[in-house]
Swiss-Prot record:
Family affiliation: In the N-terminal section; belongs to the carbohydrate kinase PfkB family.
Xref: Pfam families: CTP_transf_like, PfkB
UniProt EC number: 2.7.1.167, 2.7.7.70
Functional description taken from the UniProt entry: Catalyzes the ADP transfer from ATP to D-glycero-beta-D-manno-heptose 1-phosphate, yielding ADP-D-glycero-beta-D-manno-heptose.
PANTHER family: BIFUNCTIONAL PROTEIN HLDE, FAD SYNTHASE
Chain segments carrying region Ribokinase: 1-313
Keywords: ATP-binding, Carbohydrate metabolism, Kinase, Multifunctional enzyme, Nucleotide-binding, Nucleotidyltransferase, Transferase
Known pathway: Nucleotide-sugar biosynthesis; ADP-L-glycero-beta-D-manno-heptose biosynthesis; ADP-L-glycero-beta-D-manno-heptose from D-glycero-beta-D-manno-heptose 7-phosphate: step 1/4; Nucleotide-sugar biosynthesis; ADP-L-glycero-beta-D-manno-heptose biosynthesis; ADP-L-glycero-beta-D-manno-heptose from D-glycero-beta-D-manno-heptose 7-phosphate: step 3/4
Parts forming coiled coils: none
Reaction(s) this enzyme catalyzes, per UniProt: D-glycero-beta-D-manno-heptose 7-phosphate + ATP = D-glycero-beta-D-manno-heptose 1,7-bisphosphate + ADP + H(+); D-glycero-beta-D-manno-heptose 1-phosphate + ATP + H(+) = ADP-D-glycero-beta-D-manno-heptose + diphosphate
Sample GO molecular function, one term: heptose 7-phosphate kinase activity
Name of the protein this chain belongs to: Bifunctional protein HldE
Active site: 258
Length: 463
C-alpha cells in the first residue's frame, strides 16, 4: 500500500520489524500549583496521537517516499485500532498476534515541556506468522526496532538467516543477530549493553571503547553510538569515526533515535557506505530535533486525503494544494550553481520536514549581482533541470530580485530552510515568515562544501 506521498521507485523497499507503540501528547499550559499537592495544574490540554517505537520508524521511512512493510504486534484493542488507522494510508502492516494490548505512552506537557509520562498496556508478541516469515524471507532491506516486547524474539531465526541492515536496540530488548551491518544504540544504552571491558561514564573515549567492545561481543559489522547534539561515534574498523552534528539544536529529542535508524537503514538499502549512512542519519536526526521532534511530525491521520504529488510546473498551485489538504509546505533557497553534496544533504533534510519541498532559485541576473562576474557557471535552465531531477525536490520557483521575499510572500511556506552556514546570524526572512505563522529554521550543512570553494580549487588546479 502506498502512502499519501508518492513512492520513489529509485528507493529500495524496507521491511521494519519491531514493537509498535501508540504515543499520545497532552499539551497545555501551567501557571499555578494544585492546592492539595505541590504539582503543576496543566489546563486547556490539546490531545494528539501518533505512531511510536517501530511504528514511528516505519512511518518516517514511508514519509521519505519509500515503500515500507511493518511487522509488529498490533491487536484489535482501542490503541491497536487507532494505530492501524494512523498507519494504513502509508504502509503495509503485517500484524503479529499480541497477548495484552498495544503499549501506550502518554506525555503531559506544559508550555511544550514534559511534566509527567504515563505508560500502560504491556502487550507482548505471542508468535510469528507465516506471512511475517515470508515477508522477511524475501526482504531486500530490514530494520529491526527492538523494544523488548517479543517481535524480534519471535522472528529471530529468520533474522539470523538474513541479517538486517540496521538494528536499533533498546534496554529491554535482546542482542542483535550476528552479521547485522549496523547497530545504533544511544550512549546510555551502549554503556548498559557493553561487556565488562566497556568504559563506564560518558565522553568520547568511553563511547569508543563501548562501541568497539559491542562490535566484538555481538559479532556485528559496525556499531554507532548516538550522542545527541554531539552527533554519533562509529566503530567498524581499527579506529572510531566521530560524525559531529553540524549544528546543535536543544529541543524535544523524542523520536530522534527512530529518525536516525530509519534514515541509516534507507541509505544503506540504497547502496551507501556505512560512514555515509551514519553521516546522513546524523543530519536527519539533527533536522528532526530542530523542527520539534516527534511532536512536530505532521499528524498521520490528518493526511490520509493527500494523494501523490502532482507533476506540475506551478509551485504556487502545489503549495496551495498541500495547504488545502492540511499538509506542510517547505521551501529552501539559493543559487545552486554547482550542485554538490552540501546542497543535496540540505535539500534531503528539508524534504523530511513536510509534505512538499519548493526550491527557490536565483535567476542568472540575481546571481550576477550577488556573486559578481563569471557567475553563474551554469545557466538558469541547467540549474533548474538538475534540481528537478532530485527525488527530494517537488517543484522549483525562480526569483529575479536579490532576495526571495516576494516569492515567499506568494508561496507562504510553513517552513523556510537555510543552511547551517548561517548559524549565529539573523535570518533576513524570519520576520516575513512570522506574518503567516511560518518558521525559519537552520539545517546542518556539510563543512567545506560550497560552489565558491569548488571554483577556487578548480582554478588552482588549472594553474
Amino acid at each position: 500500500m502506498t502512502g499519501p506521498m508518492a513512492v520513489r521507485t529509485d528507493r529500495t523497499p524496507l521491511v521494519v520489524v519491531g514493537d509498535a507503540l501508540l504515543d499520545r501528547d497532552l499539551t497545555g499550559t501551567a501557571d499555578r500549583l494544585a492546592p492539595d499537592a505541590p504539582v503543576p495544574v496543566v489546563q486547556e490540554c490539546a490531545e494528539r496521537i501518533r505512531p511510536g517505537g517501530a511504528a514511528l520508524a516505519a512511518y518516517l521511512a514511508a514519509r521519505d517516499g519509500r515503500e515500507v512493510t511493518l511487522i509488529a504486534g498490533v491487536g484489535e484493542d482501542p490503541a491497536g485500532l487507532a494505530l492501524r488507522e494512523l498507519l494504513a494510508p502509508w504502509l503495509k502492516l503485517i500484524p503479529l498476534p499480541l497477548t495484552g494490548t498495544v503499549p501506550e505512552k502518554t506525555r503531559v506537557l506544559a508550555q511544550d515541556r514534559p511534566v509527567v509520562r504515563l505508560d500502560r498496556g504491556g502487550g507482548r508478541v505471542r508468535e510469528a506468522t507465516d506471512e511475517a516469515r515470508d515477508a522477511l524471507g524475501c526482504a531486500r532491506a530490514v530494520l529491526v526496532s527492538d523494544y523488548g516486547r517479543g517481535a524480534a524474539d519471535a522472528l529471530r531465526d529468520v533474522l539470523a538467516a538474513r541479517p538486517p541492515l540496521v538494528w536499533d536496540p533498546h534496554p529491554r530488548g535482546g542482542p542483535p543477530v550476528p552479521g547485522t551491518r549496523l547497530v545504533t544504540p544511544a550512549e546510555k544504552e551502549a554503556h548498559g549493553f557493553a561487556p565488562s571491558e566497556g568504559r563506564p561514564g560518558g565522553g568520547l573515549r568511553a563511547a569508543a571503547l563501548n562501541a568497539a567492545a559491542l562490535v566484538r561481543d555481538w559479532r556485528v559489522a559496525a556499531v554507532t553510538v548516538t550522542l545527541g547534539s554531539r552527533g554519533a561515534l562509529l566503530s567498524y574498523g581499527e579506529h572510531p569515526l566521530l560524525v559531529p552534528a553540524p549544528a546543535a539544536h536543544h529541543g524535544d529529542s523524542c523520536g530522534a533515535g527512530d529518525r536516525f535508524a530509519a534514515t541509516a537503514a534507507g541509505l544503506l538499502a540504497d547502496g551507501a557506505l556505512v560512514g555515509e549512512a551514519v553521516e546522513g542519519a546524523v543530519g536527519a536526526a539533527t533536522a528532526f530535533v530542530a523542527a520539534g521532534g516527534a511532536a512536530a511530525v505532521p499528524p498521520a491521520g490528518s493526511e490520509r486525503a493527500l494523494a501523490a504529488l502532482p507533476d506540475t510546473d506551478d509551485p504556487g498551485a502545489l503549495a496551495a494544494r498541500i495547504r488545502a489538504e492540511h499538509g506542510t509546505v517547505v521551501a529552501a533557497g539559493g543559487c545552486f550553481d554547482l550542485l554538490h553534496a552540501g546542497h543535496v544533504g540540505l535539500l534531503q533534510a528539508a524534504r523530511r520536514l513536510g509534505d512538499c519541498l519548493v526550491v527557490c532559485v536565483n535567476s542568472d541576473a540575481s546571481v550576477r549581482r550577488g556573486k559578481g562576474g563569471g557567475r553563474p557557471v551554469n545557466p538558469l535552465a541547467d540549474r533548474v533541470r538538475v534540481l528537478r531531477a532530485l527525488a527530494c525536490v517537488d517543484a522549483v520557483a525562480v526569483f529575479d530580485e536579490d532576495t526571495p521575499e516576494r516569492l515567499l510572500g506568494e508561496l507562504r511556506p510553513d517552513v523556510w530552510v537555510k543552511g547551517g552556514d548561517y548559524a549565529g546570524a539573523d535570518l533576513p526572512e524570519a520576520g516575513l515568515l512570522k506574518e503567516w505563522g511560518g518558521q525559519a529554521v537552520l539545517l546542518p550543512y556539510l563543512d567545506g562544501r560550497s560552489s565558491t570553494a569548488l571554483l577556487a580549487r578548480a582554478a588552482e588546479g588549472a594553474r
